[in-house]
Amino acid sequence: MITAENGPANEDLGPFQPLWDAWEESHREITEKPLSHFRRVLEIQFDEMEAHLASDNRKGAEYEVIDLISVALNLMRWLGNDPASIGELARSRAENRMRNRTAAILDKYQSRYGV
């Protein structure tokens, strides 16, 4: 992994690379958190997004979505991934799971979970 100590970060995460880089200083602490930490943080971020939407603050809601992406990236960090592996996983998942299958995915969530 490229860190501040051994060189500049790469750009494998495109526009999300700055989110990854911003959290690099807390890498060790993040990797030591229990999985339940991330679940709770996601719940908090969704609550905050809903509050922004309830007060017609779309920009605030958009920032909370960016925070959700940040949490997802830190989950990938927690799982031991670096930006290059995340980029490859995302490309692979999009191609092999999502492309031409999004309607079926939505149907699955509706039929199995009622959402």
Regions found by a protein language model. Name each.
Residues 1-65, 69-115:
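Flexible "arm" and connector segments at domain edges
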